[in-house]
Amino acid sequence: MTTLTLRDGTELYYKDWGSGQPILFSHGWPLSADMWDSQMQFFAERGYRAIAFDRRGFGRSSQPWTGFDYDTFADDIAELIEKLDLKNVVLAGFSMGGGDVTRYIARHGSARVAKLALISAVTPLFMKTADHPVGPDKSVFDGIRAGLAADRAQFLDDFSTIFYGTNRPGAAVSQGVFKQTLQIALQASLKATIDCVTAFSETDFRPDMAKIDVPTLVIHGDDDQVVPFEATGKLAHELIAGSRLEVYAGAPHATCTTHRDRVNADLLGFVQG
């Protein structure tokens, strides 16, 4: 396996396919780099260098007890970018991974970054607060943490329904995808899985938005039952100067799978533009 030993000894697993302008993919919760395989194959075949990593505590990366916060995740990305000496890199983050790449720019700047893509991302703020009334209530995330602690496998199996939107008429996702999703999710440590619920629900990225100074694409489904568009993608577009918004009508959270061809085409057009 290809890994990077981080500053605290954590082993960060990553895939590195193809050659050309680099695109670095940051995965969603509670998945791994494998969620990006279709995108990586697509871009590597078209002359790009596609890189995806397993966030600490997830997939094949090691499982530390602490460090499941966005400052740490951003610093992990910085180490990977430095290690691989990536320049003119396109950063793409899905769901909680959108927070990773956003915080990277806020903490480390955009000198090595060409563009940013936020797909079904939790930015700028996921949870409802006094000054952000459109997000899900804290009780929703309390329930997620409780469900994970009680029976993680069953909770995640059930969660896949709204993740892929298969409770909607006409939705079609194979049993193989459901099985793969659960298999990937259960590779993560329970501690990381639970702690990241707090990180992705409570981290306020609104101050980070003003620091994004590269062309940005926001992709979001308007029927996202996990990370509601009105609470996240819509506001991210409004807060990131000059960003481009692509709203997928009727699309669920997992657009990289359910709307793979459109995501790939939109990303390619954005990267080439």
Regions found by a protein language model. Name each.
Residues 6-66:
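Conserved HGGG/HGGXW glycine-rich cap/lid loop of the alpha/beta-hydrolase fold
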Residues 27-29, 89, 93-95:
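Conserved alpha/beta-hydrolase "nucleophile elbow" surrounding the catalytic nucleophile
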Residues 102-150:
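Flexible "cap/lid" loop of the alpha/beta hydrolase fold
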Residues 124-136, 146-210:
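Conserved alpha/beta-hydrolase catalytic His-Asp/Glu region
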Residues 225-231:
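Conserved alpha/beta-hydrolase "acid-adjacent" motif
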Residues 241-273:
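Catalytic active-site module of serine/aspartate enzymes centered on a nucleophile-bearing elbow/loop
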